[in-house]
C-alpha cells in the first residue's frame, strides 16, 4: 500500500490561464470560481483567465486566485479518483489550501481570510522597499550567518524559506538582500529575484501579522480530517486550536519546507500530488529526496497518469530500485575512515556478499523486491557506512 500526501503551492506559482481546463471540464470548478468571486466581491475567474500578469501577481489577488485553483484541483481529484491522503502540506499560502481541503476552514472562509491577509501583507510595505530572492548552491548555515551579520533593525534580512539542502529564499529590505546576495555569490551561490510584491516571511511583515490576529479571531478552526504539516514547526498541527497561533506567526517565520518533506519521508510517504498551478513543489521534492514519486495536478490532462494505478506503482518500484542501487554503490565506494583494519574487516566481510546479491536482484528488471528486502538493503548500507566511520553528513547524503 502506497502512502499518499497532497502538496499545495504558494505565491509565485500563479500564471494567466491557470485553472481554465478545470473550468472547461468540471461543473465543480465553475461553482468554486463563482463562490470565490462572491466571497470577495471580485471576478476571480476573469483575474485567472484574462487578467494582466502584473495584476494577478499583486499579493491580495494572487493569494485568493491560487487558493481557488488549488482547492478546485483537490476536489476534481477526489471526484475523479478519490484516494484519500495520509498527510497534507502547503508551501506558505498553500497551507491555507491544505486547511480547506482537510476541513479546518470552509472554502468561502479561507478565500475571505486570504484576501485580508494579502491586503495586509501588501500594505505592510507601501513603498516597496522589500524584496525576496532565491539563493542556490549554498547550505543553510552559511546563509543564515550572512543574514545575521548584515541584518539591522532598519535594513532587515533573513531566510524566508528553506526549500531544499541548497535552495533557499531570503527576504527583507532590498538593500540588505542585495548585500547578502553579493557575499553569497563570493561563496559560489546563484540568485534569482522572485516575482512577488512584498517581503514575505520577514520581520517587515510584523505589523501585518499583528493586524492579522484580529482577522483570525473572527474564525473558528476545526480539527483536520488528515494531519497537516505546519510551515512554522515542520510537524503536524496538534489540533484546530493551534492553527490560529501558527497562522499569525506564519507571516514572519520561515517556511521549513525541506524539513516538512523529510517528515513525510520518515513517516512512510511514497507518493505526493501537487494540487494547483505549475509544478514548483514537484521540482523541489526531487532536490530533497528520490524516495518519493511526485505528480502534478494543475490541469485536466494530468488526471490520466494519476488514474493509472498500475503505471504509478511501476514508477514507485523503479524509483526505489534506482535509488537503492545508487545507495549500494555509494556506500561501497565511499572512503573508509576506520583506521582499525581488523575491526573494519570483521564488520564488513559478512556484509559485502549480501549487498552484491541484492544489487544483482535490483538490477534485474523483472524482479520486484519485497518490503523486507528493501528494508534489509538500506540497513546493510547503513552498517557499511557506520563501519567506515563516515561523517554524519556523508551518511545522510548516501542514505537520504
UniProtKB/Swiss-Prot annotation:
One of its GO terms (molecular function) is [acyl-carrier-protein] S-malonyltransferase activity. Pfam families: Acyl_transf_1. InterPro entries: Ac_transferase_dom_sf, Acyl_transferase_dom, Acyl_Trfase/lysoPLipase, Mal-CoA-ACP_Trans/PKS_FabD, Malonyl_CoA-ACP_transAc_FabD, Malonyl_transacylase_ACP-bd. Keywords: Acyltransferase, Fatty acid biosynthesis, Fatty acid metabolism, Lipid biosynthesis, Lipid metabolism, Transferase. The keyword Protease does not apply. The keyword Lipid biosynthesis applies. It catalyses: holo-[ACP] + malonyl-CoA = malonyl-[ACP] + CoA. The active site is at residues 92, 201. GO terms for biological process: fatty acid biosynthetic process. Its EC number is 2.3.1.39. It is an enzyme of class 2 (transferase). Is involved in the mycosubtilin synthetase assembly, by catalyzing the transfer of malonyl groups to a specific acyl-carrier-protein domain on MycA. Belongs to the FabD family. This is Malonyl CoA-acyl carrier protein transacylase. The gene is fenF.
Amino acid at each position: 500500500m502506497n502512502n499518499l500526501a497532497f502538496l499545495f503551492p504558494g505565491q509565485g506559482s500563479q500564471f494567466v490561464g491557470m485553472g481554465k481546463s478545470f473550468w472547461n471540464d468540471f461543473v465543480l470548478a465553475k461553482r468554486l470560481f463563482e463562490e470565490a468571486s462572491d466571497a470577495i466581491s471580485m471576478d476571480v475567474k476573469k483575474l485567472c483567465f484574462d487578467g494582466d500578469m502584473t495584476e494577478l501577481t499583486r499579493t491580495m489577488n494572487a493569494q485568493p486566485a491560487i487558493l481557488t485553483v488549488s482547492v478546485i484541483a483537490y476536489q476534481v481529484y477526489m471526484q475523479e479518483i478519490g484516494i484519500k491522503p495520509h498527510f497534507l502540506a502547503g508551501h506558505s499560502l498553500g497551507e491555507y489550501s491544505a486547511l480547506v481541503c482537510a476541513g479546518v476552514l470552509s472554502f468561502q472562509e479561507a478565500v475571505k481570510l486570504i484576501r485580508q491577509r494579502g491586503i495586509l501583507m501588501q500594505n505592510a510595505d507601501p513603498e516597496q522597499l522589500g524584496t525576496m530572492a532565491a539563493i542556490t548552491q549554498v547550505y543553510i548555515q552559511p546563509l543564515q550567518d550572512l543574514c545575521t551579520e548584515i541584518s539591522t533593525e532598519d535594513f532587515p534580512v533573513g531566510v524566508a524559506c528553506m526549500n531544499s539542502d541548497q535552495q533557499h529564499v531570503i527576504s527583507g529590505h532590498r538593500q540588505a538582500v542585495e548585500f547578502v546576495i553579493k557575499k553569497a555569490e563570493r561563496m559560489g551561490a546563484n540568485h534569482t529575484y522572485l516575482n512577488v510584491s512584498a517581503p514575505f516571511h520577514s520581520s517587515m511583515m510584523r505589523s501585518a501579522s499583528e493586524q492579522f490576529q484580529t482577522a483570525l479571531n473572527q474564525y473558528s478552526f476545526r480539527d483536520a480530517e488528515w494531519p497537516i504539516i505546519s510551515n512554522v514547526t515542520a510537524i503536524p498541527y496538534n489540533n484546530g486550536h493551534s492553527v490560529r497561533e501558527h497562522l499569525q506567526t506564519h507571516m514572519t517565520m520561515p517556511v521549513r519546507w525541506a524539513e516538512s518533506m523529510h517528515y513525510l519521508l520518515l513517516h512512510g510517504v511514497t507518493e505526493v500530488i501537487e494540487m494547483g498551478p505549475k509544478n514548483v513543489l514537484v521540482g523541489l521534492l526531487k532536490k530533497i529526496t528520490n524516495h518519493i514519486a511526485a505528480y502534478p495536478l494543475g490541469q485536466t490532462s494530468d488526471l490520466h497518469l494519476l488514474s493509472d494505478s498500475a503505471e504509478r506503482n511501476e514508477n514507485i518500484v523503479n524509483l526505489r530500485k534506482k535509488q537503492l542501487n545508487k545507495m549500494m554503490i555509494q556506500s561501497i565506494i565511499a572512503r573508509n575512515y576506520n583506521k582499525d583494519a581488523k575491526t573494519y574487516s570483521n564488520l564488513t566481510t559478512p556484509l559485502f556478499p549480501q549487498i552484491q546479491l541484492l544489487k544483482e536482484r535490483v538490477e534485474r528488471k523483472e524482479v520486484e523486491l519485497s518490503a523486507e528486502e528493501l528494508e534489509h538493503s538500506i540497513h546493510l548500507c547503513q552498517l557499511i557506512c557506520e563501519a567506515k566511520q563516515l561523517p554524519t553528513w556523508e551518511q545522510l547524503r548516501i542514505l537520504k
